[in-house]
């Protein structure tokens, strides 16, 4: 196979890895945690994975503490936790 063909194959495999959803067995345990606003009084839009609904939902994050099931964007939440 030529070097161009190898680069194309590598690019396609990388794209497949990025676009393939996370399976439930590969989902991090913290994706099962409930939304946690934290201790601070800020009002920052954030997203968390809701395991019963199997989707990412918005909540208001206080800005500190909380738990790892807390994402700045819905895309980041879906890439990490959604199947």
Swiss-Prot record:
Q: Name one Pfam family in it.
A: Kunitz_BPTI
Q: What is its main location?
A: secreted
Which family does the record claim for this protein? Answer: Belongs to the venom Kunitz-type family.
Q: Taxonomic lineage of this organism?
A: Eukaryota, Metazoa, Chordata, Craniata, Vertebrata
CDD domains recorded:
Kunitz_textilinin-like
Cystine pairings recorded for this chain: 31-81, 40-64, 56-77
Location of this chain's protein in the cell:
Secreted
Briefly, what is this protein's role? Answer: Serine protease inhibitor.
- Tissue specificity as recorded in UniProt: Expressed by the venom gland.
InterPro entries per the record? Kunitz_BPTI (IPR002223), Kunitz_BPTI_sf (IPR036880), Prtase_inh_Kunz-CS (IPR020901), TFPI/VKTCI-like (IPR050098)
Q: What is this protein called?
A: Kunitz-type serine protease inhibitor superbin-1
Q: Where is this site: Reactive bond for trypsin?
A: 41-42
One of the record's GO cellular component terms: extracellular space
Q: Where is the BPTI/Kunitz inhibitor domain?
A: 31-81
Q: How far does the signal peptide extend, from start to end residue?
A: 1-24
SUPFAM superfamilies from the UniProt entry: BPTI-like (SSF57362)
């Amino acid at each position: 196979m030529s070097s161009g063909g190898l680069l194309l194959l590598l690019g396609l495999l990388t794209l497949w890895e990025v676009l393939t959803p996370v399976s439930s067995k590969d989902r991090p345990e913290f994706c099962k945690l409930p939304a946690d606003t934290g201790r601070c009084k800020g009002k920052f839009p954030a997203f968390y994975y809701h395991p019963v609904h199997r989707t990412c939902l918005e909540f208001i994050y206080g800005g500190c503490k909380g738990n790892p099931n807390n994402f700045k964007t819905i895309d980041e939440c879906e890439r990490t936790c959604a199947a």
